[in-house]
């Protein structure tokens, strides 16, 4: 009862607010009258209406101060009402604040009638200078803002070419629009009554918790089976080891007594200790009587730490699967695409995963060989956001494996569909990420590189990378890596030469980006395109060497060495030997054709099964079990001896997953 009394005023206020919102006018009058008779106080500031009116007033005051050039009023309101976590932690807020300081610093120069008041102008410039030396110093290494640090020291910024953009008529309205959008996002005005909000959040929370617990149960059961298999294997190995140890102790005792150990006995002990894969092949081919052989082979057998005896997954009825992928409900399609992807991503690398992939390919799961109008590939253009995303994820999983890329490359329409989806997809970030990831992995293959260059993908990438802060880390990293792979080809360099100034500006800006994972790809792209004389001339004209030397002062040792190579390339007069490769030779280069199954493929799943609903492997083996037709296939063996030193810029096609994992490049 005490708790109710403590919150009675607020609870009654919630009821009053909802009755007012739902227009129960008579009920509200009766309710208010009875509260007054009983002496029950009503909270007057409950819900969103009061907060909304206050937030709208703050937004209006900020915009007014912006329009009037009232610097102190604006930043007092800014610091009071914009959370410090946003001001200090959000990159967009930091960039916006920087440009707002520029706006107030040049306000008198732009809008004064006649000559601006010198004292007032000096005060504004001094305020801006103080900002640059304190909070604004954090952005001093960003190429975008570097020229503005000279603004307080330029006698007449209006005529200086570096600041020409600031004094254009469109600059201030565009900045004001960004400010208004930012403020609307921060304050999030809402007229929804608090009682309704509490009800909806509570109901949704319970539903999400139930689904989450169900999913956790499914995952726990799957992990439990995996751990049980591992435990049984470890226990068997332990018992085997104890048995061998006991025999060795007996043998040592026999040796002390003068009995000799036979080569056959030594061989039998060693074979029992070797991993399963080596036992049969070594049993008859190794001479264990030679001193040192047994111990050397034992140590070698420990090198590849692999799970043993991984069973093959059950075969599936692919005809029924493909039929339901084309004709089933959107929810069924999504669960099937998810389950098929999980088969690839969660299977054990080696024979199990190879068998899964080979079954998909031999049954033409994605209809790459089909010419029918209705095919599984068409799911990439589904009206359902979930189906489109899950189809893109599955294609990305295929593209993560060398044999999968070879399968997808057989049909040029796959590439064209992915390129189209990349440029059209504006609703779902994860769909776009997976399409981009697949295309980036496609760029490991020379024929696909050629097709992407001819389709003008370089121009699209450069345009997207002009504003990297709007991109997710995955999109940024894979976009830059794809651009680098295409720039390694002579046709790609020639494409870049058509917009040399723009490409150089975008790449030089990216060198200073806070995401350091992209630096090797940016360096590789710059180094490659600077082998073209016309691009070198453009780079020299824009002072590229000075820009690069700025990064040397702040970069790490690896980045510094790469930039030194780029500067050397920039100042060269002739093409280095072997830089420009012929585009006529479309032979595959398997050195870089690795399997790269990154964890991002299964992140942020959109759908969860309801109670009693099948998903994952259980869905496949319950509804789509087929006749056992699994057959293994030998992997293609590529060269694996070309390593990247890290000192020089990348000069071979790579993909971020493989590059991070240290695969040869």
UniProtKB/Swiss-Prot annotation:
SUPFAM superfamilies in the cross-refs: ARM repeat
Keywords for the protein's UniProt record, in alphabetical order: Cell projection, Cilium biogenesis/degradation, Coiled coil, Cytoplasm, Cytoskeleton, Phosphoprotein
Segments forming domain LisH: 7-39
Keyword Phosphoprotein: yes
Gene Ontology biological-process annotations: cilium assembly; positive regulation of smoothened signaling pathway
Presence of the UniProt keyword DNA repair in the record: no
Residue ranges the record marks as coiled coil: 201-235
In-chain residues carrying the UniProt-annotated modification Phosphoserine: 582
Subunit structure: Interacts with TOGARAM1, CCDC66, CEP104, CSPP1 and CEP290. Interacts with NDUFAF2.
Function noted in UniProt: Involved in ciliogenesis. It is required for appropriate acetylation and polyglutamylation of ciliary microtubules, and regulation of cilium length. Acts as a positive regulator of hedgehog (Hh)signaling. May participate in the trafficking and/or retention of GLI2 and GLI3 proteins at the ciliary tip.
Name listed for the protein in its UniProt record: LisH domain-containing protein ARMC9
Organism whose genome encodes this protein: Pongo abelii (Sumatran orangutan)
Encoding gene, per UniProt annotation: ARMC9
């Amino acid at each position: 009862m005490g708790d109710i009394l403590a919150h009675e005023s607020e609870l009654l206020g919630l009821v009053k607010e909802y009755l007012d919102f739902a227009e129960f006018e008579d009920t509200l009058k009766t309710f208010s009258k009875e509260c007054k008779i009983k002496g029950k106080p009503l909270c007057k500031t409950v819900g969103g209406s009061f907060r909304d009116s206050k937030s709208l007033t703050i937004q209006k005051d900020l915009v007014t101060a912006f329009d009037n050039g009232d610097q102190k009023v604006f930043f007092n309101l800014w610091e009071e009402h914009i959370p410090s976590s946003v001001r200090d932690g959000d990159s967009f807020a930091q960039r916006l604040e920087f440009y707002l300081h520029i706006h107030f610093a040049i306000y008198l120069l732009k809008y004064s009638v006649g000559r601006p008041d010198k004292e007032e102008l000096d005060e504004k410039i001094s305020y801006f200078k103080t900002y640059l030396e304190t909070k604004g110093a954090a952005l001093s290494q960003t190429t975008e803002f570097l020229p503005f640090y000279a603004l307080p020291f330029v006698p007449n910024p209006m005529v200086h070419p570096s600041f020409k953009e600031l004094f254009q008529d469109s600059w201030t309205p565009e900045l004001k629009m960004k400010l208004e959008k930012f403020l609307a996002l921060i304050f999030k005005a809402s007229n929804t009554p608090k009682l309704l909000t509490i009800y909806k959040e509570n109901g949704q929370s319970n539903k999400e918790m139930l689904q989450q617990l169900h999913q956790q149960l499914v995952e726990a059961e799957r992990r439990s089976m995996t751990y049980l298999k591992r435990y049984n294997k470890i226990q068997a190995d332990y018992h085997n080891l104890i048995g061998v140890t006991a025999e060795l102790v007996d043998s040592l005792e026999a040796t002390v007594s003068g009995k000799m150990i036979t080569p056959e006995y030594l061989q039998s002990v060693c074979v029992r200790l070797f991993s399963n894969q080596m036992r049969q092949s070594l049993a008859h081919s190794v001479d264990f009587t030679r001193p040192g052989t047994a111990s050397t082979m034992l140590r070698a057998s420990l090198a590849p730490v692999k799970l043993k005896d991984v069973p093959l997954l059950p075969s599936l009825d692919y005809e029924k699967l493909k039929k339901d992928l084309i004709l089933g409900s959107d929810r069924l399609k999504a669960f099937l695409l998810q389950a098929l992807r999980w088969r690839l991503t969660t299977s054990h690398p080696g024979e199990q995963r190879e068998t899964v992939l080979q079954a998909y390919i031999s049954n033409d799961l994605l209809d790459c060989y089909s010419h029918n109008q209705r095919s599984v590939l068409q799911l990439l253009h589904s009206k359902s956001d979930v189906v489109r995303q899950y189809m893109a994820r599955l294609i990305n999983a295929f593209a993560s494996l060398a044999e999968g890329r070879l399968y997808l490359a057989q049909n040029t329409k796959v590439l064209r569909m992915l390129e189209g989806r990349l440029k059209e997809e504006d609703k779902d970030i994860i769909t776009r990420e997976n399409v981009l990831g697949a295309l980036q992995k496609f760029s490991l293959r020379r024929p696909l590189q050629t097709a992407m260059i001819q389709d003008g993908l370089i121009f699209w990438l450069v345009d997207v990378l002009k504003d990297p802060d709007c991109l997710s880390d995955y999109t940024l990293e894979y976009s830059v890596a794809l651009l680098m792979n295409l720039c390694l080809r002579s046709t790609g360099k020639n494409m870049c030469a058509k917009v040399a100034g723009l490409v150089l500006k975008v790449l030089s800006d990216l060198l200073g980006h806070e995401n350091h994972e992209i630096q090797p790809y940016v360096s590789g792209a710059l180094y490659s395109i600077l082998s073209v004389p016309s691009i070198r001339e453009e780079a020299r004209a824009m002072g590229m060497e000075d820009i690069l030397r700025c990064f040397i002062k702040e970069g790490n040792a690896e980045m510094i060495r790469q930039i030194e190579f780029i500067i050397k390339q920039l100042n060269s007069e002739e093409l280095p030997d072997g830089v420009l490769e012929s585009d006529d030779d479309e032979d595959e280069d398997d050195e870089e054709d690795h399997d790269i199954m990154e964890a991002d493929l299964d992140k942020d799943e959109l759908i969860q099964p309801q109670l009693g609903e099948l998903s994952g492997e259980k869905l496949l083996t319950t509804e789509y079990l087929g006749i056992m037709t699994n057959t293994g296939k030998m992997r293609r063996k590529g060269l694996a001896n070309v390593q990247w030193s890290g000192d020089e810029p990348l000069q071979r096609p790579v993909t971020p997953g493989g590059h991070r994992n240290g695969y040869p490049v």
